[in-house]
Amino acid sequence: MSEAQTVSSEPGIVRDLTAFQHNILVILSEEPMYGLAIKRQLEEYYGTEVNHGRLYPNLDDLVEMGLVEKSELDKRTNQYALTEEGYQALLDQLSWTFSKVVTDEERAADLEELIGAAR
């Protein structure tokens, strides 16, 4: 897969996530959500419709990997929440990205500015 990225959520454990799956984890880092809310946020990000046939199998894969927890809200609606392992996978990915991007003080300042703006 061309979208694949490798992240390690624990020493010795390697997770292969697509960019789409990574984006789901990022969305769930805000708060637990049901599937259609995740779908809407992905559509906003991508600027195009996200097919149910793409979303739900990816959510199921993330649940199977232990990065997302699935719970039943009612008979028809499931809620998805980021697990501690999923959160750690996001931190590991950010750490790796920052280690490659931050090559001098100016770039470090740029990232500090981004982080400050997000607060």
Name these PLM-found stretches.
Residues 1-3, 23, 119:
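Long, compositionally biased intrinsically disordered regions
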Residues 75-94:
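Basic, amphipathic "hinge/linker" alpha-helix immediately C-terminal to the N-terminal HTH DNA-binding motif
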Residues 1-14:
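Short, Lys/Arg-enriched N-terminal segment that forms or immediately precedes the first helix
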Residues 25, 55-65:
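Basic amphipathic alpha-helical segments that dock to polyanions
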Residues 20, 54-58, 78:
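Short, conserved alpha-helical segments within structured domains
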